[in-house]
């Protein structure tokens, strides 16, 4: 059983253990992706996040 979340009307995370909400919306995993030192695509991910201002300030 994994911790999942969905966003409420204010954009805040609401945590649950269910895979779907009562409205039928699929929840997202609250756990970060596994880290791998052999990550081949980290440069591309960082470049895209910078381009779309998704990196934390």
Curated annotation (Swiss-Prot):
Gene Ontology BP term (one): positive regulation of telomerase RNA localization to Cajal body
One of the Pfam families matching this protein, by short name: Nop10p
Residue segments, region Disordered: 22-42
Lineage: superkingdom: Eukaryota
Localization in the cell: Nucleus, Nucleolus
Protein purpose: Non-catalytic component of the H/ACA small nucleolar ribonucleoprotein (H/ACA snoRNP), which catalyzes pseudouridylation of rRNA and is required for ribosome biogenesis. This involves the isomerization of uridine such that the ribose is subsequently attached to C5, instead of the normal N1. Pseudouridine ('psi') residues may serve to stabilize the conformation of rRNAs. The H/ACA snoRNP complex also mediates pseudouridylation of other types of RNAs. The H/ACA snoRNP complex mediates pseudouridylation at position 93 in U2 snRNA.
Similarity comment text for this entry: Belongs to the NOP10 family.
Protein name, per record: H/ACA ribonucleoprotein complex subunit NOP10
Species this protein is from: Candida glabrata (strain ATCC 2001 / BCRC 20586 / JCM 3761 / NBRC 0622 / NRRL Y-65 / CBS 138)
């Amino acid at each position: 059983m994994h911790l999942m979340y969905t966003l409420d009307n204010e954009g805040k995370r609401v945590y649950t253990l269910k895979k779907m909400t009562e409205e039928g919306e699929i929840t997202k995993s609250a756990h970060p992706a596994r880290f791998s030192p052999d990550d081949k695509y980290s440069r591309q991910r960082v470049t895209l996040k910078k381009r779309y201002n998704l990196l934390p300030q």
